[in-house]
A protein has these predicted regions:
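Terminal or standalone catalytic/regulatory effector modules within metabolic enzymes
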Residues: 1-170
C-alpha cells in the first residue's frame, strides 16, 4: 500500500524533472516526503513506562513551533503516544491502521525503519515513516510523519447531497 501512495508522488517528481532518476534520488524523494517532515508537528522529548500491559507516555512535541507537553495511556508505546497526541496536542482523531518495521542493516547498532499507516476521522489512509536506532522512537517518528502528512494533504471533497425529488403536480 505504501508503494501505491509513494509511486504517484515519485512519478510526478520524475515528470517535473523530465528525466530518469537514480536510486539515490528516489531515496531522497522518499526521505523528503516521509522521514524529514517536521511541520506542523515535531517530536521534542519522548518517554514511556509500562506496567502490566498498560503503558504511559510522557512527551513534548512542537506544534507549529510551540512546545506542548502531552501524556497518555495505551496498551503499548504507540497507542499511548497516539492517545497523548489526540487528547493534548490539538491533533485530529486518528487510528493506527497498519504498522511495519524493518532493520536497515545488521547488528545491535542498526537503525530501524518504521512504517505506520493512519486512518483519519475523515476516512483517509495516510502513511508515515520514521528512522532511529531505537525501535520505539522509529515508530513514534513514523506516527509524527503520518500526522504531518495528513495535515498537509487535503481532505477528499465532500460528497454532493443526494438529488431532491419533488413530485410533479397532478
Amino acid at each position: 500500500e505504501l508503494q501505491r501512495e509513494f509511486g504517484p508522488l515519485a512519478n510526478d517528481e520524475v515528470d517535473r524533472l523530465g528525466r530518469e532518476v537514480s536510486a539515490a534520488e528516489l531515496q531522497a524523494m522518499f526521505w523528503k516526503e516521509y522521514i524529514d517532515r517536521t511541520s506542523p508537528c515535531a517530536l521534542h522529548h519522548f518517554h514511556v513506562d509500562g506496567v502490566d500491559g498498560v503503558f504511559r507516555c510522557r512527551a513534548s512535541v512542537l506544534i507549529e513551533g510551540t512546545e506542548v507537553k502531552i501524556e497518555g495511556d495505551g496498551n503499548g508505546p504507540i497507542a499511548a503516544f497516539v492517545t497523548a497526541l489526540v487528547h493534548h496536542a490539538r491533533v485530529s482523531a486518528f487510528t493506527v491502521a497498519t504498522f511495519k518495521q524493518q532493520s536497515l542493516s545488521a547488528g545491535t547498532e542498526a537503525s530501524a525503519l518504521a512504517f505506520i499507516q493512519i486512518k483519519t476521522n475523515d476516512e483517509r489512509h495516510i502513511w508515515g515513516a520514521g528512522v532511529d536506532t531505537n525501535i520505539e522512537l522509529a515508530s513514534i517518528k513514523a506516527v509524527i510523519s503520518a500526522v504531518n502528512r495528513a495535515a498537509t494533504r487535503p481532505a477528499p471533497p465532500a460528497s454532493p447531497p443526494p438529488p431532491t425529488i419533488v413530485p410533479l403536480p397532478t
